[in-house]
Amino acid sequence: MNLRPLHDRVIVKRQEEEKVSAGGIVLPGSAAEKPSQGEVIAVGEGKLLENGERRKMAVKAGDKILFGKYTGSEVKVDGVDYIIMREDEIFAVIE
């Protein structure tokens, strides 16, 4: 199944969770922090402005991004976890 985000929404695949702490302690899945990095999988057409024009998206598929730990809505499609968020919830693109 393919997902196509609408308007200024972005579909992101979260980076894998860290299983070992900085001190070398193995963390169970429930104790590991949600990573705030991911890869953009798909982007919408852009935000519709009041004058009827669309603002071009600043990110594209394949970009690595930083975002808040509790940003967006989590969905599971074909056994894969994704986050759907608005473009303005993205903090930065990792270059």
Curated annotation (Swiss-Prot):
Q: Which InterPro entries match?
A: Chaperonin_GroES, Chaperonin_GroES_sf, Chaprnonin_Cpn10_CS, GroES-like_sf
- Pfam families attached here? Cpn10
Question: Which GO terms of the molecular function aspect are on file?
Answer: ATP binding; metal ion binding; protein folding chaperone; protein-folding chaperone binding; unfolded protein binding
Swiss-Prot/TrEMBL keywords? Chaperone, Cytoplasm
Q: Please list which residues make up the signal peptide.
A: none
User: Is the keyword Chaperone assigned to this protein?
Assistant: yes
**Compartment list:** Cytoplasm
The entry describes its oligomerization and partners as: Heptamer of 7 subunits arranged in a ring. Interacts with the chaperonin GroEL.
User: What name goes with this protein?
Assistant: Co-chaperonin GroES
